[in-house]
Amino acid sequence: MDSNISDWHARFRDAEAALNGVVLGQARTIRLLLISALCRGHVLLAGDVGTGKTTLLRAMARALGGPYGRVEGTVDLLPTDLIYSTHIAEDGRPRIEPGPVLEQGEDMAVFFFNEINRARPQVHALLLRLMAERSLSAFRREYRFPHLQVFADRNQIERDETFELPAAARDRFLMEIAVDAPAAPEDRVALAFEPRFHDTTALIAEVGQGILPYRGLNGLAAGVQSGTHASPALRRYVFDLCEALRNPASAGLALEGADAARLIRGGVSPRGMQHLVRAARACAWLEGREAVLPQDVRAVLAPVMAHRIFLSPAYEPRREALVPALIDAAFATIPVPAA
């Protein structure tokens, strides 16, 4: 068993190095994607146009290996388009072909929804079931996708012909990760001037196919969750952080320009806390530890929790500034347990 765990650690190190080699300046996002794979959780990337979201998700899908489905979000996309398509065959008869969800079979490893905010709410509803249950009903039978991980991205710039994801759909994503352009000038220069980064298909092919064998991840994830421990003090720390995000005024949090007592419309759910714990355990395992430390919780709290915090309507227009400030205030206020 120990040798098997050692092999998995080596695979994750290789995958992280390969992904960082083809997607520059996104080390934090790559680590979070690996944590999500280890948790078997779905991921939504949000960012500006041209920041590498699609390239990163395609590279991650290649690292996982296995069948891979993809759909482009458009305003005229229908739920049935995910399941099947129809056309007139050469013999003049109508034919039904599997859509992007079914064409790869039940062994599908990754389903990638590009520009998810361009799809209508009816499509989001179908995706919600696929994410929540990893199953789908079609053609009088039930299809099950035990290895499925859903990746999606959305463009934060364009607002025309877009539809905001409902809270229920966003809550099904383990993480919502903000992707910005690389901060280091040398990375931006390399992306602009090195031809290697101009051919996206060839670049992604540099990532070894199936570095992280997807069929083994369910068993590994279960072992990580059962074998990575959290002390009573750490458990209390997680609880206090989540309570502070639910009721900042009671926790003594202060935010400039906001009334803490009126800030929150809906806070962290029990499922959100479960996801936080799962991600923190995966983070600890990737660091080679058998126990969760406060830094593991802090490393994953924002991407796991930010999209699960619902502000009062008066404060929602300032969400991008207030939610990070709220999380920082919780970190500053809630005492960190001793190691």
Curated annotation (Swiss-Prot):
One of its GO terms (biological process) is methanol metabolic process. It is found in: Cytoplasm. CDD domains: AAA. GO terms for molecular function: ATP binding; ATP hydrolysis activity. Keywords: ATP-binding, Cytoplasm, Methanol utilization, Nucleotide-binding. ATP binds at G47, D48, V49, G50, T51, G52, K53, T54. InterPro entries: AAA+_ATPase, ATPase_AAA-3, CbbQ/NirQ/NorQ/GpvN, ChlI/MoxR_AAA_lid, ClpA/B, P-loop_NTPase. GO terms for cellular component: cytoplasm. The keyword Iron does not apply. May be involved in the regulation of formation of active methanol dehydrogenase. Belongs to the MoxR family. This is Protein MoxR.
